[in-house]
C-alpha cells in the first residue's frame, strides 16, 4: 500500500523541481512524473519525493483533515500505552 500526501506548491525551482508544504514541513519534490504544469498555490499528491498528480483544494483539505485525525488517534494510543506501562 502506498500513501500520497496532499501538499501545496510554494515555489517552482529549476530542474523540474518544486518546494511543497506538507503538513507544515517544506521539502523539495520532483515534478518529473507529472504530465501537466503546476503553479504556486496548486495542491498536489506527493509520494516519496515525487509529485504524482494535481488535486483540487477541497480534496486536499479533506485528506489532510483525515491524516490529522489518524495522527491524533495514534498519539492518544501511544500515550495510553505509556501510561499503562508506568
Curated annotation (Swiss-Prot):
Q: In which pathway does it act?
A: Protein modification; [NiFe] hydrogenase maturation
One GO BP annotation of this record: protein maturation
Gene Ontology molecular-function annotations: carbon dioxide binding; iron ion binding
What outcome is recorded for mutants in which this gene has been deleted?
Strains missing this gene do not produce hydrogenase; addition of Ni(2+) to cell cultures does not compensate this loss of function. Interestingly higher than usual urease activity was produced in this strain; this effect was increased by increasing amount of Ni(2+) in cell cultures.
In terms of PANTHER family, this protein maps to: HYDROGENASE MATURATION FACTOR HYBG
Question: What is the protein's known function?
Answer: Involved in the maturation of [NiFe] hydrogenases. Involved in the biosynthesis of the Fe(CN)(2)CO cofactor.
What family does this belong to?
Belongs to the HupF/HypC family.
Protein's UniProt name: Hydrogenase maturation factor HypC
Could you read off the lineage of the organism from its UniProt record?
Bacteria, Pseudomonadati, Campylobacterota, Epsilonproteobacteria, Campylobacterales
Amino acid at each position: 500500500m502506498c500513501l500520497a500526501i496532499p501538499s501545496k506548491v510554494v515555489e517552482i525551482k529549476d530542474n523540474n523541481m518544486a518546494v511543497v508544504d506538507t503538513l507544515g514541513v517544506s521539502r523539495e519534490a520532483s515534478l518529473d512524473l507529472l504530465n501537466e504544469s503546476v503553479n504556486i498555490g496548486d495542491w498536489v499528491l506527493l509520494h516519496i519525493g515525487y509529485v504524482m498528480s494535481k488535486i483540487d483544494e477541497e480534496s486536499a483539505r479533506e485528506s489532510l483533515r483525515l491524516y490529522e485525525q489518524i495522527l491524533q488517534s495514534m498519539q492518544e494510543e501511544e500515550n495510553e500505552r505509556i501510561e499503562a506501562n508506568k
